[in-house]
């Protein structure tokens, strides 16, 4: 996809603001992406980034949990968040005239999270139930096992949600330390697409996000071991078997990715594909 109206600004404190103007829509999608995910965790705190994401909507020093939702939903908008291996994103979708409201709420949940002990313990229970649901889904669990075998003894090989044991043992202090280390301006990208003027977006970001220069964020670098032939079998008393196999390939920007996309269509792209 070609970004015809793509603009980017880096503020003095390192925070990056990116936008693309799309004149065919009247809404905007706005995301605050913190470049910290499960890949930045140690084995001991696996699942912390995801748990922290859950805590974002439990209340801030300015808003209750209900107010966070109401301030967006009363405008016909939607607010949510997700965690990946390399980043955590807090996002909203709403009409373009409510850009300031969106920036205000997202800035609040990212910067002013209360992290109350009782909320943390409550969300641990929620996350543990999510993990149980994944463990009850063969199609989900084989993907976790596949990644584990593909990246053994590496953060990429660990589940984003963590495990029952690691999530249960995470302390508030560990969450605070993780936040202090990674939730810094130079480690945050604010992106918007839709009917949004870049200059206006930058203005609102400067208004609601801290302009202080925080600690320079340092990420740990983990080296991949060569791929070896490995397998894992998980037996469950169900009638249907689920099989997944694969290997690591070239980087995502390699020109051969186009050939791989074509191969994907040939093998599994429809009723006439080879593997159907």
PLM regions: where:
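Short solvent-exposed loop/turn micro-motifs enriched in small/polar/acidic residues
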Residues: 1-3, 225-228
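N- or domain-start disorder-to-order transition segments that initiate the globular core
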Residues: 1-27
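Charge-rich, well-structured scaffold segments of protease-associated domains
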Residues: 5, 10, 21, 65-217, ...
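Short beta-strand or tight-loop elements
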Residues: 13-15, 227-230
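M16/MPP (pitrilysin/insulinase) zinc-metallopeptidase core fold and M16-derived inactive scaffolds
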Residues: 29-93, 270-272, 276
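A short acidic-to-branched-hydrophobic micro-motif
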Residues: 30-34, 106, 241-243
């Amino acid at each position: 996809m070609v970004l015809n109206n793509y603009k980017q600004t880096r503020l003095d404190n390192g925070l990056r603001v990116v936008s693309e103007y799309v004149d065919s829509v009247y809404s905007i999608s706005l995301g605050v992406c913190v470049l910290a995910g499960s890949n930045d965790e140690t084995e001991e705190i696996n699942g912390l980034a995801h748990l922290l994401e859950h805590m974002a909507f439990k209340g801030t020093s300015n808003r209750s949990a209900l107010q966070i939702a109401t301030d967006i939903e009363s405008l016909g908008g939607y607010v949510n968040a997700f965690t990946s291996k390399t980043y955590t994103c807090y996002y909203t979708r709403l009409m373009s005239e409510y850009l300031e409201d969106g920036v205000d709420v997202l800035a609040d949940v990212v910067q002013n999270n209360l992290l109350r002990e009782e909320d943390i313990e409550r969300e641990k229970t929620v996350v543990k139930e999510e993990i149980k649901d994944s463990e009850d889904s063969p199609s989900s669990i084989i993907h976790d096992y596949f990644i584990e075998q593909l990246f053994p003894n590496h953060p990429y090989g660990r589940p984003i949600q963590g495990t029952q044991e690691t999530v249960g043992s995470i302390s508030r202090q560990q969450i605070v330390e993780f936040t202090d280390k990674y939730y810094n301006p130079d480690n945050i990208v604010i992106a918007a697409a839709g009917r949004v003027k870049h200059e206006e977006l930058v203005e609102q970001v400067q208004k609601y996000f801290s302009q202080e220069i925080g600690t320079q964020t340092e990420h740990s670098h983990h080296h991949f071991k060569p791929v070896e032939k490995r397998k894992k079998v998980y037996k469950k008393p169900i009638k249907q078997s689920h099989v997944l196999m694969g290997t690591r390939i070239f980087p995502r920007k390699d020109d051969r990715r186009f050939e791989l996309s074509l191969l994907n269509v040939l093998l599994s792209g429809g009723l006439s594909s080879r593997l159907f």
